[in-house]
């Protein structure tokens, strides 16, 4: 947050913090934050580039990436993240049933559980690899896997933005890691 506001956007500390009662105390309310963030004219991609890249299938990790089916149907971010005109960061599984049947709430939960399990296994297996014992090709693969995994972690959706793509990426990474461990 400070990196984005102070370093990238060159905002003054006093924009959010006051020294009236106690130096550095946050003086802004959620409404103040929302006056800049998530206003109608803001494009989600401006701040949520990784999430949009996963959703649109343009993250650049695999050669044959596909967009999420909801992206194909022109469902924008606000459909899941703006129920009732109150923008939220993390969409709730219960919001799925606003457009889908009641069983669909479990679909998202199952997707996220599956991605979490894949992510945890891959992370655990990565810790078993000694990069110094790998040849240059595998060292480069390992670096790509770590960078891709960082993007998946930064997405924070556990597959909600594109379950099929994120699952395929993790499967491909796991295959490569398994080969390195053999």
Residue ranges and their predicted role:
Residues 30, 123, 146-149:
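Residue-level signal for cytosolic alpha-helical hairpin/rod architecture
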Residues 1-118, 132-136, 152-164, 168:
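Inter-heme linker and motif-flanking segments adjacent to c-type heme-binding CXXCH motifs
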Residues 139-182:
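Histidine-centered catalytic/metal-binding microenvironments
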Residues 122-134:
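Surface beta-strand/loop "capping" patches
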Residues 77, 128-130, 177-182:
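Short, charged low-complexity intrinsically disordered segments located at boundaries
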């Amino acid at each position: 947050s400070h990196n984005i506001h102070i370093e990238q956007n060159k905002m003054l500390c006093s924009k959010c913090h006051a020294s009236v009662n106690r130096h550095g105390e946050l003086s802004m309310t959620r409404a103040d934050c929302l006056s800049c963030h998530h206003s109608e004219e803001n494009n989600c991609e401006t701040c949520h580039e990784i999430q949009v890249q996963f959703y649109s299938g343009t993250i650049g990790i695999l050669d044959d990436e596909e967009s999420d089916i909801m992206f194909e149907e022109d469902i924008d971010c606000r459909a899941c993240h703006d129920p009732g005109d109150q923008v939220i960061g993390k969409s709730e599984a219960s919001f799925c049933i606003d457009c889908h049947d009641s069983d669909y709430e479990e679909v998202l939960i199952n997707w996220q559980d599956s991605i979490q399990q894949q992510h945890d296994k891959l992370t655990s297996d990565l810790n078993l690899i000694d990069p110094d014992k790998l040849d240059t090709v595998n060292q480069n693969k390992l670096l790509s896997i770590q960078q891709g995994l960082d993007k998946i972690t930064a997405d924070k959706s556990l597959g909600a933005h594109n379950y099929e793509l994120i699952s395929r990426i993790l499967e491909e990474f796991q295959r490569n890691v398994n080969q390195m461990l053999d």
